[in-house]
Swiss-Prot record:
Subunit and partners: Homodimer; upon association with membrane. Part of the coat protein complex II/COPII, composed of SEC23/24 and SEC13/31 heterodimers, that it helps recruit and assemble on endoplasmic reticulum (ER) membranes at ER exit sites.
Organism per entry: Arabidopsis thaliana
EC primary class: hydrolase
Sequence motif: STAR, positions: 2-4
EC number: 3.6.5.2
InterPro entries (alphabetical): P-loop_NTPase, Small_GTP-bd, Small_GTPase_ARF/SAR, Small_GTPase_SAR1
MF (Gene Ontology): GTP binding; GTPase activity; metal ion binding
Name of the featured protein: Small COPII coat GTPase SAR1A
Gene from which the chain derives: SAR1A
Keyword Transport: yes
Signal peptide: none
PROSITE patterns named in the record: SAR1 (PS51422)
Amino acid sequence: MFMIDWFYGVLASLGLWQKEAKILFLGLDNAGKTTLLHMLKDERLVQHQPTQHPTSEELSIGKIKFKAFDLGGHQIARRVWKDYYAKVDAVVYLVDAYDKERFAESKKELDALLSDESLASVPFLILGNKIDIPYAASEDELRYHLGLSNFTTGKGKVNLTDSNVRPLEVFMCSIVRKMGYGEGFKWVSQYIK
């Protein structure tokens, strides 16, 4: 039994075996967190009521098996976000790219997350959702309004091992059209240890 455990341990350390991760889905209410979670879980698009209580799902994407927590985005739900920061491997922060009036509020919440010491080394995938709606913000516009124009790390494979730079990138997506978020998850998965 020891040899088998050792062998699987070696495979896992080389990134050749399935990784496990805890991922938080955060963002303001109506950004698409629950819709994304259900799309990833069983590829179904359903109208959802606003999330009132934290929910979790176990999912697999590629070689990563992860437990995803949808914590809700309304003001009362945001108070419990901090309770879930322990041992988190990545944060997926969704922004409604069409609802430009709430960009300042979304920036405020994102800034609070990015400045929280317990999340200092956690990779952040920021998804600008609802790009299928006419007049939704462009990626550059969203970066500007979130104050991220000079703070993202690049969409390719960037070696950040020896730096104190947190992986952080913006990807635009449309959950209802099933586009964009796959590239984002592929990007963030390379930083999940």
